[in-house]
Amino acid sequence: MSGQLNVAEDSVLLDDISISSIQPIVSDVPAAEDVGDEDHISGASIAENRPKDPTLVKYHAACQRGDLKTVKDMIEAGVIDVKADWDEEEQVSGLHWASANNRLNLVRYLIAQGADVNIKGGDLEATPLHWASKSGYVYIVHCLLEHGADPLITDRQGYNLLHTSTFSSEVMLITYVLFTGQIPVDSPDPTGKTALHWAAYQGDPNTVEALLKFDADVRVVDTGGFTPLHWATVKGHPHVLKALIEHGSDVFLKNNDGKNALMIAQEMNTQKALQNALYECGFNKDGFAIRKYFKNPMHAKMVTFFTPWLILGLILSFFAYFSILLAILGCLLTVLAAGYGLYNFVFPSFILMKRIVIFKTPLLAGILSGTIFWLLYVWLFKMLPATFDDEPILNLTVFALFAGVVFLLTKLLQSDPGYIVPATDHNQIRATIIELLRVGKYDSKHFCIHSWIRLPLRAKYKRFVHSVILRYDHYCPWIYNYIGFRNHKIFIYFILLLDLGILALAKLCLEYFDELKDHAKNKDALKCSILSKDLCAGFTYDPFTLFLLEWVCVQGMWILALSFVQFFECLKGVTEHEFAHWQRRNRGVVGREHVFNTAPEELMEEDPEEERNKLRSLGAAGQRHCCSTLTTATGFDRFLSVIGSSLGRQPRTTHNPINYPIETDYGWKQNLKDFWLTSDISAPMWRRILLPPVGTRGLLNGQEVDYQKLYNLPERVISIEEIV
């Protein structure tokens, strides 16, 4: 069984998993500033409790807490010999303790003084490289390897650097080790388990993904006949199971006990996870291929896109020509039948998810385009013939506006929001990693663990399309596409034309109803208790058009709210994604995304937000109401949030007494210029305003920047009001 990795962004929450190992490991000894003679270390020793050399105890404690001054004083005074700085029975050196506690400066100093980087110590006879890698300390591992540490050395259990790195579940370290190219990805331990076996057993999707990208063998078996899929089934992590199945794991392969993955899942109560993974890979619960009714996924998407055109026409007809009860019944039956057909016969051909997220299908885009289709239909065949003589300018305006809407919608559906192609050149990727290590920024905030590129500022990786998007704004299900640097301006023009088109069409529709009223044969029949005479004429003589107008006005409300949000964010020089992050930051709420970072303290830049993260609580972030899906789809959640911020109602928490400025806000005038003007100053002004940016270059604070290589923001002057 094999297939292409296609994980829906919203359904896969791998980014929610925190595998940070920034906290140092310490022994039993309290890490006091001054270690007295009575202190002792016993945490990682094979020796029993016994009196120890107080000088060695003090030295090891200093190595643990990174006290470089004390270590230097003891070595330079001759009290400690760095080439024999261990207890004879334990064999745990100062380099072991410094490595295990992420003390980079101390590690460098000890190596410079002649410490053996390959010395084995402790009950597992492990090297400093093993100690550092088990904690995920990539900077220490890099330093040790640069100074001659052997990655192929194994400890007493037979684990090499790749195995111990896998145990840490620190994906930044795993990626680094793989790109060194010094260890075969399928190197086994004494029981025949590879790193992929261990990662699968741990339920570590990020490590599994990295190993599979390096062509780790999914069919290799250990001494018990277990494949990585067998061990993944024991753990039951659905995303790990899915990745292994997609890369060719055989669900029917049996281990030495004669059990396949299906049997193990039943014994370990992980059947649901395995069945979900099988389904998302195109197989039923028994492991056999699901029938797909469309060989070409694009054909299935087209059916999904055009289905709302028909459904919308039927629903409007039901309400126009049947009683309210029959109309509601007809609508329910139509929607249920359409949903059943799409879910069972259409969706499986292009998206396989147990819980289909309609946002990730062209369905909502079909609703929007279907609405436009029926609007054009009633305008062309009903309103235009009846009103052109009296309202020729208004009719031409409606035609021009909706011609623009159709053109821009077609363009948006096919547009590139600013994708960055994932890196494939291993030498280039390796150089990027080394550079980030050099500057202390090798973490998932600056390096994409999925596409292996250095992440520019304002960019974001989206798993649904397996790409990083420049100046990412948001995902819009109504155009079935992401909004980013290259199509953001088109999107705003689109919603602006929609707003104007709805207003013009509503006015023309009222003129049309007025014509119906004037030409009515029996004007006494126009009796409506709550409607005006014009609307009453529409209800009496053309209810289809009246209900379509009502539907369009409802749509117009959220489009108007979306327009307000977009223009507000343009004024503030911020994207929707950045604005949401800024609000969470000011509320003191921890986001779902975690930065995988094991940089030593001496390399970490001061970031007050990281300190505040320790005090934050998810609190209100986890609260959701019954209409959350609806408000998210229509954008009203962002509208209400923007209204609150514009009125100065940004909440503050006990742990967050100040408001942080928006880093990309250079003043509303400059922000508007940066957004609306392309960076090509030689082009005519109308082209700079109307056309979207070409390539990856744009304006920021009036300066031309390459958004694909934007690693530092232009300087920004902070006003007194922002400081107070």
From Swiss-Prot:
**Catalysed reactions, semicolon-separated:** L-cysteinyl-[protein] + hexadecanoyl-CoA = S-hexadecanoyl-L-cysteinyl-[protein] + CoA
Question: Which residue intervals are topologically Cytoplasmic?
Answer: 1-308, 353-360, 414-489, 565-724
Residue ranges of the ANK repeats are: 54-84, 90-119, 124-153, 157-187, 191-220, 224-253
Annotated membrane topology: Multi-pass membrane protein
- SUPFAM superfamilies xrefs: Ankyrin repeat
Q: Which residues lie on this side of the membrane: Lumenal?
A: 330-331, 382-392, 511-543
Q: Which GO terms describe its biological process?
A: negative regulation of pheromone-dependent signal transduction involved in conjugation with cellular fusion; protein targeting to membrane; regulation of endocytosis
Disulfide bond entries: none
Specify the DHHC domain's residue ranges.
Answer: 446-496
UniProt GO cellular component terms: early endosome membrane; Golgi membrane
UniProt-annotated location(s): Early endosome membrane; Golgi apparatus membrane
Major location category of this protein: membrane
E.C. number, please?
2.3.1.225
Q: Which residues cross the membrane?
A: 309-329, 332-352, 361-381, 393-413, 490-510, 544-564
Q: Which UniProt keywords apply?
A: Acyltransferase, ANK repeat, Endosome, Golgi apparatus, Lipoprotein, Membrane, Palmitate, Repeat, Transferase, Transmembrane, Transmembrane helix
Q: Where is the active site?
A: C476 (s-palmitoyl cysteine intermediate)
GO molecular function per UniProt: G-protein beta/gamma-subunit complex binding; protein-cysteine S-palmitoyltransferase activity
Family named by the database record:
Belongs to the DHHC palmitoyltransferase family. AKR/ZDHHC17 subfamily.
For domains, the record's comment is: The DHHC domain is required for palmitoyltransferase activity.
Q: What does this protein do, in the record's words?
A: Palmitoyltransferase specific for casein kinase 1.
State the name under which the record lists this protein: Palmitoyltransferase AKR1
